[in-house]
């Protein structure tokens, strides 16, 4: 009969527990997997599969599991995973911001529904753009690149409790400007054309006051906006590809700055 000693149990716990925390933190904040529609069992099972695949290749550590230092180490692993997943969310937040701006210009800001992920009201156009970005993310194998970056963190910042560089987290907060910058850049063509249309409607109202601009303007703005969205669709894929590449480069820079040397 196979007998397992307490030292072996602690060794296995030390080998798999710390990577599991980092992987779980990433899955809990990463795009797609962080959706509430994904069952918790699926998230846990995927995290365990990834952990069992990468843990045997990691350098051994002798951190006491039941100690105050282990508590700090657990917090550190969770922070690293959250930083990776949260940064990746910037790309999708930029696309959602573009959808909200476009919907506001088209007069669709009142058309909202409950987002199943956050349980908050989200404009319909923003949700459509978000779903399109998710599909493009899978098409570009973004999920595989994200897992690859996660594996790289175990070599750049091995499990051992080394202090983290606070400048890396400062760079993460500054990177939030990418949300508004890229969102505005994506929506800028439609903003310009719809603003021109609104100016033309304003001049028409001054020239012919008997015309009801509210009756004419809303369907005209909506029709032109939908037509412009259809024309913009072929450009969304290369834009999202560039946006994902920019975020992955940002992630690589943050990972390289995390160790405090």
UniProtKB/Swiss-Prot annotation:
<feature type="transmembrane region" description="Helical">
    <location>
        <begin position="213"/>
        <end position="233"/>
    </location>
</feature>
<comment type="similarity">
    <text>Belongs to the FliR/MopE/SpaR family.</text>
</comment>
<dbReference type="GO" id="GO:0006935">
    <property type="term" value="P:chemotaxis"/>
</dbReference>
<dbReference type="GO" id="GO:0005886">
    <property type="term" value="C:plasma membrane"/>
</dbReference>
<dbReference type="GO" id="GO:0044780">
    <property type="term" value="P:bacterial-type flagellum assembly"/>
</dbReference>
<keyword id="KW-0472">Membrane</keyword>
<dbReference type="GO" id="GO:0006605">
    <property type="term" value="P:protein targeting"/>
</dbReference>
<feature type="transmembrane region" description="Helical">
    <location>
        <begin position="13"/>
        <end position="33"/>
    </location>
</feature>
<dbReference type="GO" id="GO:0009288">
    <property type="term" value="C:bacterial-type flagellum"/>
</dbReference>
<dbReference type="InterPro" id="IPR006303">
    <property type="entry name" value="FliR"/>
</dbReference>
<feature type="transmembrane region" description="Helical">
    <location>
        <begin position="45"/>
        <end position="65"/>
    </location>
</feature>
<dbReference type="GO" id="GO:0120102">
    <property type="term" value="C:bacterial-type flagellum secretion apparatus"/>
</dbReference>
<feature type="transmembrane region" description="Helical">
    <location>
        <begin position="66"/>
        <end position="86"/>
    </location>
</feature>
<comment type="function">
    <text>Role in flagellar biosynthesis.</text>
</comment>
<dbReference type="GO" id="GO:0030257">
    <property type="term" value="C:type III protein secretion system complex"/>
</dbReference>
<feature type="transmembrane region" description="Helical">
    <location>
        <begin position="90"/>
        <end position="110"/>
    </location>
</feature>
<dbReference type="GO" id="GO:0030254">
    <property type="term" value="P:protein secretion by the type III secretion system"/>
</dbReference>
<protein>
    <recommendedName>
        <fullName>Flagellar biosynthetic protein FliR</fullName>
    </recommendedName>
</protein>
<keyword id="KW-0812">Transmembrane</keyword>
<keyword id="KW-0997">Cell inner membrane</keyword>
<feature type="transmembrane region" description="Helical">
    <location>
        <begin position="131"/>
        <end position="151"/>
    </location>
</feature>
<dbReference type="GO" id="GO:0071973">
    <property type="term" value="P:bacterial-type flagellum-dependent cell motility"/>
</dbReference>
<keyword id="KW-1133">Transmembrane helix</keyword>
<dbReference type="InterPro" id="IPR002010">
    <property type="entry name" value="T3SS_IM_R"/>
</dbReference>
<dbReference type="Pfam" id="PF01311">
    <property type="entry name" value="Bac_export_1"/>
</dbReference>
<keyword id="KW-0975">Bacterial flagellum</keyword>
<keyword id="KW-1003">Cell membrane</keyword>
<feature type="transmembrane region" description="Helical">
    <location>
        <begin position="184"/>
        <end position="204"/>
    </location>
</feature>
<feature type="transmembrane region" description="Helical">
    <location>
        <begin position="235"/>
        <end position="255"/>
    </location>
</feature>
């Amino acid at each position: 009969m196979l007998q397992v000693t307490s030292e072996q149990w602690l060794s296995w716990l030390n080998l798999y527990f710390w990577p599991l925390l980092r992987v779980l933190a990433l899955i809990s904040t990463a795009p797609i997997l962080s959706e509430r529609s994904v069952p918790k069992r699926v998230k846990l099972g995927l995290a365990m599969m990834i952990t069992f695949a990468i843990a045997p290749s990691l350098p051994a550590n002798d951190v006491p599991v039941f100690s105050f230092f282990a508590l700090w180490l657990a917090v550190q692993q969770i922070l690293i995973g959250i930083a990776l997943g949260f940064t990746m969310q910037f790309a999708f937040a930029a696309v959602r911001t573009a959808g909200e701006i476009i919907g506001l210009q088209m007069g669709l800001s009142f058309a909202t529904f409950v987002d199943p992920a956050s349980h908050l009201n989200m404009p319909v156009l923003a949700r459509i753009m978000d779903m399109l970005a998710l599909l493009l993310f899978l098409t570009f194998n973004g999920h595989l690149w994200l897992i690859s970056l996660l594996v790289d963190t175990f070599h750049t910042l091995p499990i051992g409790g080394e202090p983290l560089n606070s400048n890396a987290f400062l760079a993460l907060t500054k990177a939030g400007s990418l949300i508004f910058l890229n969102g505005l850049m994506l929506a800028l063509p439609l903003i310009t054309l719809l603003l021109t249309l609104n100016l033309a409607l304003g001049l028409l109202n001054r020239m012919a006051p008997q015309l009801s601009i509210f009756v004419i303007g809303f369907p005209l703005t909506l029709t032109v906006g939908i037509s412009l969205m259809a024309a913009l669709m072929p450009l969304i894929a290369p834009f999202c590809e560039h946006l994902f590449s920019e975020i992955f480069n940002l992630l690589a820079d943050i990972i390289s700055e995390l160790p405090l040397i």
